[in-house]
Amino acid sequence: MNEGFTYLETGKYKQAETFFENILITYPKNKTAKLCYGRALGLNGNGERATTIFINLLERYPQDFEIKLNYAESLLWNENYNKAKDYYKNLLEEKPNSFPALLGYANTLSNLKFFNEALEFIDKALLTSPGNLNALTSKKYINLGYANQYVQNGDYKAALKLLLKNLQLFKKDIETLQNIANVYLISSDFSKAEATYKTIGISPQNKLTSLNSLALVSHLKGKNKKALEISSKAINYISNKTSESLLQQTKERYAQALIWNRKYKKADILIQKLNNEYPNKNWVLSLRASLNIYKSNFEKSINDYNRILKNDTTSFDGNLGKANALKASGYFIESYKSAENTLKFYKNQKDAVNFIKKLDKSFTPFVVAESSYSFDNGNNKAYSYKATSEFSFSTKFKLLGSYNYRTTSNSLSGLKATSNNVLGGVSYQLLHNIKLKSLIGLASSKTETNTFNQLVADISLLTKPFKLQNLELGYKREIQNFNAALLAENIVQNNYLINYSLNTNFRLGWFTQYYYTTQNDKNTRNLIFTSLYYNILEKPSLKAGVNYQNISFKNQVPTIYFSPSKFNAYEVFFNIIKDENITKENEWFYELTAASGFQYIENSKKQRTYRIQSKLGYKFSERSILTLYGSKSNIASATAAGFTFTEIGLRFKWFILRKPFFRKR
């Protein structure tokens, strides 16, 4: 039977199965042949038949320890781990130093995720048989499983400690190195991840795996051009010896790199070709869905994610990708469900957890307290104190409120005034792409000679009529409270406004605003502002462009407020921003806008203008953010009075709850 033993030892289980089956035709009661036949069946994927054979053998030879060991192992083949655990425990009571029993028990505990105990018994097995390759291999996989458990619980240091121990057992082991790199990726230690992937790539057979991973690291570092360069290199490295799975991974990464670099036409052609080559394959459908998200074709993206989930309900890309597309489309409840479904299959998966956290943040109640000091070259100065708050009762409905106290004075005229504005209202999502916001309140103004009370309002309808477009229709009723002289005039403005923005898939953007204003002093105003800009960088966000503004008043009352019959301003600007919403805890964020141009006031000669706006903030935690901001401008339209204007302020934002009110119940 030596030929059959060789088949088993070399992993040729089908040949072993056939060999021992033929032996049993001649010798049907041969114990060794039956035992080996059972092993061949089990190792070839027929675990249940193997178990039946071992049970029959145990009925004839109830004290045979080798048969008991094979029966215990067959329980592992059938993934009956709890039963295997109890059985191996009994075997170890019978023979505490049995190497196969210790090894089998350790593997059983590992499958049940009792990794600490599994390590204890694998070490006992290695004491019994020092340096045994099977035991060392089992220890490697126990460490990998244990490390993954630590990763799921967010303990990356403990995970790395275990993985580095693996490298002591198997120097430069590729699986271990890949897991180490993955921990660095998850913990955003991209430099160490990059170094680890480069180590993996030293071996020629792992070069493609290394390049594909290095392209991803470059993307995560915000270096998309480098990612495409690396991925292009990987495509050129493909040969006829490349395995099918690695070939697919490389093509997938190249398509992703094209998408990251906004080369949508090339990506689309490649994905169509892949779809013809691999019809209805999830990895290709995921690429197409991802491309459509980048192009804001969210409905098409959702359709592809649904096809993915039809093929595989547990798909990570399908569940979390769909959640992302639903969120972008305004279907927030469905987005929550899809993200939570991801966590059912991938416990504590970091991307899914972070997605839900970000979605929660959109609906978590908060309060913003703000104070500012401003002055101009007309001897006006003002102190302003403001508080605003939002409280969401659902993904559709939220309460809004604000209070503003402002004092203003003029050192030349001696005029002083104060104003108090209180507004309260609601925001309601009517449809997935339409939201109504309405605030109504009271403005109380007090000068040295009079007190005024006026109704104020802020009502707007925000829509997304087409992809990459936003449209706002609004009405605002407000009091001119820039300085004491204006407050004394008790000028009420009724503003009817339209805001329209258009983004494109080729980095160009356009924003236009129109105001038509009527005032209780019988004056009217028309204001048009338009901005054409180009997005130069994504991280940090950097854009530059040109602005144009036109203002005209029906009546000119320059002694009271800036009210030209015609006013035109042109400027070029750049804006750089690190958004507070993407900033991590204990990190800084910032924004700087600088602009320069010319303004034409009625028939006067052109005047040079400048505008600087900046802010610097720090995120102490996910719940508290402090921001210092300032601005300076000599553009006449920057203030109601047409003066050069400077403002500095401090803003503190605090999230009252840790998560949305409607998700705490």
Predicted regions and their residues:
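A generic tandem-repeat structural signature
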Residues: 45-128, 132-141
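Amphipathic alpha-helical segments within well-ordered protein domains
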Residues: 21, 123, 339-340
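Gram-negative and organellar
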Residues: 7, 65, 70, 99, ...
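An N-terminal domain-start capping segment
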Residues: 15, 49, 83, 87, ...
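N-terminal leader/linker segments that initiate helical-solenoid repeat arrays
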Residues: 1-37, 45-55, 59, 63-66, ...
